[in-house]
Amino acid sequence: MDRAQKEKVVEELGQIFESSGVVVVAHYQGLTVANMQDLRGRVRDAGGAVRVAKNKLAKIALDGTDVAGISDLMTGMTVLAYSDDPVAAAKAADEFAKENDNYVILGGAMGENILDADGVKAVAKMPSREELISSIAGCIGAPAANIAGAIGAPASNIASVLSTIEEKAA
């Protein structure tokens, strides 16, 4: 890899570290190609991406960023899983780690916050953005449904009483 290629990789990694909602750093020594493809597929399905980069280039890219604290994690065979959604990549990486002993989460970053392995696992347990939006929408819609039910209830009760009177008269 020549100098121009290295500079391009550093620039790409810098954009990843600056713009991603979450970055998960893990060791992947011992994973097969099939395992790596599975990891990439899971993270991609969650809306993220996976990247293997030279540690030295990743450390250069991290220098001067808000998440420079994760540069200490860049030792050995490291892989980055990242996504714009602050939960997606962490959730996919955590699920993959539970099934593969050779994939060891070291830590990561969420926004400007540096996370250890337990922090990444805690983020993975959080509901995704879509789940939060749907639960908020459900909470907002529930009072309207209750009001509509309350408005319609007296008419339904009157109809029920009239029906009962009619049955007794017959």
Curated annotation (Swiss-Prot):
Q: Which domain of life is it from?
A: Bacteria
* Presence of keyword Ribosomal protein: yes
Q: Which Gene3D superfamilies match?
A: 3.30.70.1730, 6.10.250.290
Provide a GO CC annotation, any one: large ribosomal subunit
Key words of the record: Ribonucleoprotein, Ribosomal protein, RNA-binding, rRNA-binding
Q: Which cysteines are joined by disulfide bonds?
A: none
Q: Which InterPro entries match?
A: Ribosomal_uL10 (IPR001790), Ribosomal_uL10-like_sf (IPR043141), Ribosomal_uL10_bac (IPR022973), Ribosomal_uL10_bac_type (IPR047865), Ribosomal_uL10_CS_bac (IPR002363)
Question: Which one of the record's GO molecular function terms can you name?
Answer: large ribosomal subunit rRNA binding
A Pfam family that the UniProt record links to this protein: Ribosomal_L10
What processes does the entry annotate via GO biological process terms?
A: translation
The family line of this record is:
Belongs to the universal ribosomal protein uL10 family.
The protein's job, in short, is: Forms part of the ribosomal stalk, playing a central role in the interaction of the ribosome with GTP-bound translation factors.
Subunit record text: Part of the ribosomal stalk of the 50S ribosomal subunit. The N-terminus interacts with L11 and the large rRNA to form the base of the stalk. The C-terminus forms an elongated spine to which L12 dimers bind in a sequential fashion forming a multimeric L10(L12)X complex.
The identity of this protein, by name, is: Large ribosomal subunit protein uL10
Organism from which the protein derives: Jannaschia sp. (strain CCS1)
